[in-house]
Curated annotation (Swiss-Prot):
Keyword ATP-binding among record annotations: yes
A biological process term (GO) from this entry: regulation of cell shape
Name of the gene encoding the protein in the UniProt record: murD
Pfam families for the chain: Mur_ligase_M (PF08245), MurD-like_N (PF21799)
Record's catalysed reaction(s): UDP-N-acetyl-alpha-D-muramoyl-L-alanine + D-glutamate + ATP = UDP-N-acetyl-alpha-D-muramoyl-L-alanyl-D-glutamate + ADP + phosphate + H(+)
Family named by the database record: Belongs to the MurCDEF family.
Its EC number(s): 6.3.2.9
Name of this chain's protein: UDP-N-acetylmuramoylalanine--D-glutamate ligase
Signal peptide: none
Cell wall biogenesis/degradation found in the keyword field: yes
Coiled coil (UniProt feature): none
Known pathway: Cell wall biogenesis; peptidoglycan biosynthesis
Function: Cell wall formation. Catalyzes the addition of glutamate to the nucleotide precursor UDP-N-acetylmuramoyl-L-alanine (UMA).
Top enzyme class: ligase
Amino acid sequence: MQLNKYKNQNVAVFGLGKTGLSAINALTKSGARIYAWDDHEEQIANAKMMYKKCNFIHPKEYNWHEISALVLSPGVPTEPHWIVKLARRFDCKIKSDIELFLEAKTTNQKVIGVTGTNGKSTTTSLIGHILKSAGKKVAIGGNLGVPVLDLERDAEIYVIELSSFQLELMNEINVDISALLNITPDHIDRHGSMENYIATKLKLINGSEVAVIGCDNEITADIFNKFTGDKIPISVTYSPMSFQCVTLESRKEKPLPTTQMTEGGARDLISLAGNNLLDYSEQITGIDRNYLDPSVSYLDDKRGTGIQKISLKLENHSLSVSDVKINLISNAENIAATYAVCKVLGVDSNTIINGIKSFSGLRHRNELLGKIRNVFFVNDSKATNAKSSEKAILSYENINWIAGGRSKKGGIESLSKHFTRVRKAFLIGESTEAFANVMENKVDYVKCCNLEDAFRLAFEEALNSAEEVTILLSPACASFDQWKNFEERGEAFCRMFENLRYNHTCCLV
């Protein structure tokens, strides 16, 4: 990405991980003079090898009056980090790589921003997948995979995943479409309060021409009702929605709006939930329709068991479990948001549906690895909070649940109503004692030394069952007590599965 605005300007970059190095690369190619630093010596040493012309000087020695901007990596908290205080003392603009990208893109290039506590990576990828299948030149990145400044310069549409860390840094946002999927407590240690966390998410929809907002979540439903811009509600629950609704057909030929407001407030409201997205009517009666029934199994059709006629209604189309490669329960909200975004962009319904059917999903997200004897193995390492784990637990029954790590606010108390699905829990990490207290007298559990110990014990226990068992790694916790990230945790689980499968195959030869 060409950042011509910063040609011959002095720009400071702090935080020399993937995002910071991406910013240095783009700024250097654009003719900026770079001053780079990091809190960690090894990061500085690595950057020095890559960018020998940069000035690697401690920020306390900068002439801040000559610095045009400080580009801050999302891993660096704005409060109370010393570099932020230093820059503010000299009224230096603090920017994120996303802001540099939005400044540099051309006016005819569309940007879709996706955020939410859960589901944003899958939604971002699915939108990109469908747009590519529709023949659009698409670039996908941000918090997911490729930093935005490394994306192709000539894309028609950019689909960007935005985390709360990235949004926190942003002062100005201007995107064509935003998708806010849900908000539940997360990253409170970074943001200081739930109110601050919510405020980061609001930045995105407030800076968008059209906002797609999930309304099955109390917080985001409230945001939807108060938001006065052009907005689209999505829902996958039975609960009737208290929103004015029009059909997507009424918007088919309507271009993206150039303003957010009309005289009467919101331009129109488009509902994907007029007749409820998820249809369980053939299988379920008399349940609490505010949420899925914890006594009913919503199993993946690949298992060959459970309810197989669950369908997702999207206008005149219906998707069943067997139609898609991804877990329908876990991804219903993601699919609904994707459908809305693609319709606003003018993609026809058949192309969207075919794209949903052909999408293979992402690693570590309710990922069915395979079966050994009577035991299925599911890698849901991305589930770093209770709400995310809830969707996985609702997808299976007879579960040996591997859970734990660095706990988020609220822990797993909200999952107690689903403990009937869990035959035994195998607890790991810092949260072990707290999770054990919640499970006491409700579900059997064992405290494990580590993931390897939990994997071994869960499999040994499952072999004692005459029924099929699912070993589910869905930690409901961050990974940072034992791993670099959720990917590393998930890869370790996958290696354990592959080693076990190899050993059992050898035994059968």
